[in-house]
Amino acid sequence: MAAELKIPLDISDVEVLDTEISNNGRLIITVESQVETISCGICHQPISCNYGHGDPIKLRHLSVLGLETYLRIRPRRGQCQSCLHEPTTTQVLDWYQQRSPHTRAYDAYLLKQLVNSTIEDVSLRENLGYDAIIGALNRQVDNKINWAEVEDLRTVGIDEIALKKGRKNYAAIVTGRQANGKIRVLAVLPDRKKRV
């Protein structure tokens, strides 16, 4: 009998249906949503997810045992009976963003990998394109800071990341350590000059 290993995904409201290792050595975990309702895309009323499934999407997730890991999900759909023309809405769960190729956890991981590293280095290490790293960076950093969510500004850090190897191509990341110990990105500045 083959040995089994159980690893928590730390993703809520899903059930694991299948796991497989593809021919190119990638771990693909097929999951299904357990959330029964969604908000209508037009009137925002809760509707039942009883209108089938959308097209399958594959999202890059945190590596498991050194393997590139992907979550495959067919999002549930619902049809609003209250709106004119009875539109359908496809479910988007809280652990990924619509049209993102990564889970939120993987985007946060990529942002941490950028500390003391370049985008090109992270791109090579993670087997991702340059634009995928930039996209993860843009998704993780809010355009505007909600200062009500910032609990503590006693510890502020400023770090620079090299966008490319060489000179004159840097961005500055401003972070703050919260009371619970988590690091929050406050801003990404276009360069490291004092005038910014």
PLM feature segments, named:
Residues 29, 40-43, 80, 110, ...:
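Mobile genetic element proteins and their domesticated derivatives, centered on retroelements
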Residues 102-117:
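Short, amphipathic alpha-helical "recognition" segments used to contact nucleic acids or chromatin
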Residues 132-196:
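RNase H-like nuclease fold core
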Residues 45, 127, 138, 142:
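Residue-level detection of the helix-turn-helix DNA-binding "recognition helix"
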Residues 1-85, 91-92:
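Short, conserved DNA-binding cores of transcription-related domains
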Residues 58-60, 99-102, 194-196:
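Short, surface-exposed linear segments at secondary-structure transitions and domain or protein termini
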Residues 120-136:
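Short, basic interhelical loop/turn and adjoining N-cap
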Residues 84-106:
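Short, Lys/Arg-enriched anionic-surface-contact patches
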